[in-house]
Amino acid sequence: MQPTPLERAIRAAGTGRALADLLGVTPMAVSYWKSRGVPARQAIPIEKATGVSRHDLRPDLYPAEDVQAP
C-alpha cells in the first residue's frame, strides 16, 4: 500500500512532531489529520515545508492544473 500524501509529508519532515513544529500546530493536530484529512488552510504550508504538493494533499481544492504557481 502506498503512503498517503500526509504520510509522505510526515516522512519528509522526519516525524509527525517535526511536521507539527514546522507548521506551528500540535502533534495531536497532525495525528487528527490522518483520519479526518488535511485542513484547507494547511495544504500550502505543508507543501512549502515538505514539497508534497497541495494537489496531492487536497485535490478537491487544488486541481492538477493549479499545482504550479507562477
Regions picked out by a protein language model, each given a short descriptive name:
Residues 35-36:
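Residue-level detection of the helix-turn-helix DNA-binding "recognition helix"
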